[in-house]
Amino acid sequence: MDINVDLFDEEVRREIARRSLHEFIQYINPEYITSHFSETVCASLDNFLVEMMTGKRPILILGAPPQHGKSDIVSRYLPAYFFGKYPDKRVGALSYSSDLAGDMNTDVQRIMSSDEYRVLFPQSWLGNKPTDGVAVKRNTEEFGIANHKGTYVCAGVGGPLTGKKVDLGIIDDPIKNAKEALSPTVKKSIWNWYASTFKTRLSRNSGEIIMATRWATDDLSGRVKEKTPKAKVLAFPAINEQGEALVPELHPLDKLLETKAILG
């Protein structure tokens, strides 16, 4: 075994992980189940970040069936990766409940506290005692990047973001279930919150990602697309036109067909 070659290979692997979200996820979690779905989503997010950092203010609407890993990629790994590359930026993460948003917060912190992450991005850390002596918030609602301006805040959709500026805004499942999704009152309330609260907190060179299970054409995703033609839509059915499962390693075709038959 050539130790120098092994060290070189490891450094190359680390450098690739710093440049690619998909490779970053695999470096942090070698057991992560990769798929064409995960590759496509990560490639779109890599491009999204390029557009965001060049001032294009991108909007990405991502639709995928439940339990296929979209939240893992966008709400857990992406914020950690983003802070690694841009430790002075600010992330706002919203979901249908503050408890769920808090769980996402905890998962992001766990990733950023791992040895693997610290090797890739040593400048982006969550230490409670930074070298400059300034206290750093770290709880289930908010945390900061030590010795940098970066902050992560989370809240439930409909809740306040008063005083919080956001560069990368992530809305992950703004509606809890189909009953709420079909309610005109709920849809109106979410739209009003999006327009009057979420949008007003975005910075000049921001980017926003909206993920949701689609139950209605006039939901948040649909209205954003209607009002903002530049928004890009990335939609994945559980079973494609060729009759193949989206991620068979997670949900095989026979299971999806059973579910489809039950739902009608």
Question: Where do the language-model regions lie?
Answer:
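Conserved RecA-like ASCE ATPase "motif II neighborhood" in helicase/translocase motors
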Residues: 137-197
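Residue-level preference for the first positions of well-ordered beta-strands
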Residues: 59-61, 90-92, 151, 168, ...
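Conserved nucleotide-state-sensing and coupling region of NTP-binding domains
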Residues: 94-158
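Contiguous, well-ordered alpha-helical segments that form the cores/surfaces of helical PPI scaffolds
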Residues: 43-46, 72-84, 172
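Walker A/P-loop
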Residues: 56-77
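N-terminal accessory segments
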Residues: 1-58
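Non-catalytic, compositionally simple segments
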Residues: 179-264
